[in-house]
């Protein structure tokens, strides 16, 4: 055997061995394409598509810490020290388009922690039976604050009453409802018509709400009923709402006007009337037949906004509040606020002191 034959034989053996190994090799499948999260800008900033769907989701919320001192301007009692409270609010919005309009949901979870001054000097202990210190101590709570579905102008679920939301609440101050304007959270079914000329209207059937001392839910099949009309333009808006309370068979109404003096300065005024001259009802919770609120906002700079609100009711309660909202950095706002309440007339017999001065500083990180 010559050298040439030996080389040819070796080459043939190598080719055969390579073919056998190739036949036994495992071929890896092609990797599936990764579906990255897509931004959804159809409903504003912060939305993204839920993978595999055409539904847009937004996750947002805030962390808040309040420090309060002085008097409680709602009750007139002396805090006798610092009251402090924290809240973490987590919110979810979803939206998608259907043949009947935009289908949406909104939910908000609140986790609260309150640590108030004990209201008792020089000692610890359980003072829950002492009315002078009942608001002291530590409390915690978790709430499903909101959970509702929207489709076009239709809304069903847990929300705040249209008696508040449709007209625009009150001012941009923390202690805005010292003169109360009605209960807030409720189960409801509502429909809002929005025209193309600035006109809108609402009708709502509501279950009723509650506050610290009273339950204002309905006592049968007849719901609370709220209706409202609004006209809005570049100059501002005017809105009115009327509500019927079937439990006490009385009604309440209010009208609010907002005017944009400039792009930085705006004012508002709201008047309300109730056929039942008592705060113990679902809607007209001010004292007496009537109440009035008013306020102003001035955007001084991109970081600083001044807010002022005043209110007075038929029974003689007067409340004034002012604050400065300072945006330290984007997403983090510090708001010092000072409030004063004068309890006159029929309110004198319900509070500890006729005059109350209180202060609060709020630290809030929104995301």
UniProtKB/Swiss-Prot annotation:
Changing residue 304 to A: In strain: 83-210. InterPro entries: Porin_alphabac (IPR003684). It is a multi-pass membrane protein. GO terms for biological process: monoatomic ion transport. GO terms for molecular function: porin activity. Changing residue 139 to N: In strain: 83-210. The keyword Transport applies. The keyword rRNA processing does not apply. Residues 1-22 form the signal peptide. GO terms for cellular component: cell outer membrane; pore complex. Keywords: Cell outer membrane, Ion transport, Membrane, Porin, Signal, Transmembrane, Transmembrane beta strand, Transport. It is found in: Cell outer membrane. The pore formed by Omp2a is larger than the one formed by Omp2b. Omp2b pores have optimal permeability to allow growth and protection against harmful compounds. The larger pore formed by Omp2a may be advantageous for intracellular growth, when the bacterium is competing with the host cell for nutrients whose concentration is particularly low within the phagosome. Forms passive diffusion pores that allow small molecular weight hydrophilic materials across the outer membrane. Consists of 16-stranded beta-barrel sheets, with large surface-exposed loops, that form a transmembrane pore at the center of each barrel. The pore is partially ocluded by a peptide loop that folds into the pore lumen. Belongs to the alphaproteobacteria porin family. Monomer. This is Porin Omp2a. The gene is omp2a.
